[in-house]
Amino acid sequence: MSAEMTDLNFAEGRPLMGEKEDDITVLLQEYVTQEHDIETAHGIVHVTMCGTPKLNRPVILTYHDIGLNHKTCFNSLFNFEDMHEITQHFSVCHVDAPGQQEGAASFPAGYMYPSMDQLAEMLPGVVQQLGLKSIIGLGIGSGAYILTRFALNHPSMVEGLVLININPCAEGWMDWAATKISGWAHALPEMVISHLFSKDEVHSNPELVETYRQHILHDINQNNLQLFVKSYNSRRDLEIERPIPGSNTVTLKCPSLLVVGDSSPAVDAVVECNSKLDPTKTTLLKMSDCGGFPQVVQPAKLAEAFKYFVQGMGYMPAASMTRLMRSRTGSAASSSSQDGNRSRSHTNEGSRSRSQTGDGNRSRAHTGDGNRSRSHTDTNNVNSDHNTPKSMEVSC
């Protein structure tokens, strides 16, 4: 890991100006950052709105993991050059879980922190009070769980989801026991570190881990963090099921991109989640040389996958594709993911698979903003030789 990887910038990002004034005029809206404390039925939530929402397209809404806030979780990604093309087309709404934002005061004694279900039910109020048309969710860990619950309860508000390290299951009794034992032996920050990073990462990338350890120790209110962690550890099972024709199963209705690093502590949970979603609307992206923080360690891959994802939804038809496009003639690394399958095979950097819109088989025709097709990439075409459709699994 190079030294630059751990030199993290947590300042609010701004899109880079284009080289041509014409490009600026066409693509860049005035980039305004506004912070809001929004009152909801389950308490106040702090949000940061970047850019002015456009009436004919959704807003990217982010939700961070435990031990983080929106800056330390996502600024490395949004400050990355390849993401600037996306932020020229979409406004971004960053949501901080209650009490996790910078400078948050401690909750009073006896305060009942919202459950994970209640945190999800805060989001309709955010969308409505900010006057947003709809959202594309980007969440990691606990934030991915919250956004998924929100999408299940309010499908009309969510056009798509990018879920990093999603765990759809309630905490098992063995996990509960491990948490209790860890709580006796280690401080809260170490418990959070074990959630964010695998043991391999702790040893192979100590600088990055130490950067976030210091952030958790000094920048996050410890009392509030403990409440958030307790809420996440008390989560319910999402109870999603892979849809069967003719049945009334609970599953996501929107296109979904599941992302996980090959050494992430959440890799098995993400594969299991993939097995429970609609295979015609879901893509699983496994990243090599990456652990629990793909948005920090592999921002180029994640930005490129995000571009493909929104293109598959009918947005940004002229977006430039670089890294993954150049490898379009390489071997396709897509394989079917089935229940119980825990394959962790990955292609090398020179054999990257198409991340979202399978270039050879997928239509990229798009209509204007007012009449866009919201269909996801046609994953049925990839496995048309099978009787049962299977979700796309991609390694890069």
Curated annotation (Swiss-Prot):
Disulfide bonds: none
Gene Ontology cellular component terms for the protein in this record: cytoplasm
Gene Ontology biological process terms from the UniProt entry: pronephros development; signal transduction
Keyword hit for Zinc-finger: no
Keywords tagged on the record: Developmental protein, Repeat
Sequence repeat start-end pairs: 340-349, 350-359, 360-369, 370-379
Spans annotated as Disordered: 326-396
Protein name: Protein NDRG1-B
Known role: May be involved in pronephros development, after specification of the pronephros.
Region annotation (4 X 10 AA tandem repeats of G-[NS]-R-S-R-[AS]-[HQ]-T-[DGN]-[DET]) ranges: 340-379
InterPro entries: AB_hydrolase_fold (IPR029058), NDRG (IPR004142)
UniProt cross-references to PANTHER family, sorted A to Z: N-MYC DOWNSTREAM REGULATED
Basic and acidic residues bias (residue ranges): 366-377
Regions of compositional bias (Low complexity) in chain numbering: 327-340
Compositionally biased spans, kind Polar residues: 378-390
Top-level taxonomic group: Eukaryota
SUPFAM superfamilies named among the record's database cross-references: alpha/beta-Hydrolases
